[in-house]
Amino acid sequence: RSLWWPRGKVLGGSSSINAMCYIRGHAKDYDEWEQLGAEGWNWKNVLPYFRKSEGNVRGTSALHGGDGPLTVSDPRYLNPLTPVFVEAATQAGFDANDDFNGERQAGFGLYQTTTRDGKRCSSAVAYLNPVRKRKNLKVITKATASRIIFENGKAGALVYAVDGKGGFCEAAAKEIILCGGSINSPQLLMLSGIGPAAHLRQHGIDVLVDAPGVGGNLQDHLDVCTMHKCTQDITYDNINQALAGLRFVLFKQGPGTSNVAESGGFWRSPLAEDERPDVQFHFVPAQLDDHGRNKVPGSGFTLHACFLRPKSRGRLYLTSNNIQHKPRIEAGYLSDADGFDMKVMLEAAKQSRRIIAQPAFDAYRGPEMFPGDTAQSDA
């Protein structure tokens, strides 16, 4: 089965195409990174950088920055179903949480978003736009890095193509920062001769460093979705786009300012291995099939639940020695030997159903479209 893996080939990277929910990792995540060998990456050390980068509209606090370049905002508009979901979560016994990046992560509430004046605040908007006129900054668009040239064991230059035409090369005065993301960074390293030796030779690439870990240990958060029809035509499925656009242009208000996934929560399942929540929920007042790429008629809502720390691992493989040829992504979803990931996902799906079954949804809950009424066992 093939799944869609979108990436942000645009200024700002995937921060220009994501759902804009502003979520840091749990404090223990960073402490664990350091325990695994990433010296200096503990929570105490990274928090000042989170605060420095953040421009939260709520202002400065012990855990938040108020004047950083990345604007973090509260919702300007909520779909009528969003507060219904939050109320239903409370009725189901979950704690309310008005700040998922505060003292505790667990609980349900509204997401803050990386938005400014009702518009997306990507990393390009936050960091690049303010310095575009610097004389020592050159931004090349429509460019694809194809290989890093190493000199005496150090990255010395970058080979790239523009508009598909190769032959360009830039030498590094000081350093090359590799920031192609979880897919393109390992692909570029392998094309440059750093990766599993046998795999590189298979594609005619000279091996500089035999590094089996490059392309490996791939982890992703798989969603399990519960989708219902809505008995009232109030979701984002049939929104008047022209009217929403006009309202946004004139007043910077209305549905055009929404990130759609306006609410959600974090839950510590019975299978959690420590104090951290291990499941995250996103409530979407729309019918999302295949990332919203398939239009579903009528009105509905979707509750997404994902396991935050899967044990399953995947790997990235080259398909050729050409950067233009997309790599093969073997995600390895639900492939862990003891089936632990599947067990957590089943618990998450049950909680999704329990939340939607609460009285708050009685006036809105239509038939369950997915997984459907016939799905009544763990099998």
Give the predicted meaning of each segment.
Residues 27-35, 150, 314-316, 326-330:
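Cytochrome P450 core scaffold surrounding the K-helix E-X-X-R motif
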Residues 1-52, 208-213, 221-230:
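N-terminal glycine-rich phosphate/pyrophosphate-binding loop and immediately adjacent elements
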Residues 148-151, 155-248, 254-255, 321:
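Glycine-rich loop(s) and the adjacent beta-strand/alpha-helix scaffold that form part
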Residues 26-29, 42, 81-85, 123-127, ...:
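Stable alpha-helical elements in mature extracytoplasmic
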Residues 47, 53-101, 109-111, 231, ...:
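FAD-dependent oxidoreductase catalytic-site/capping-region signature
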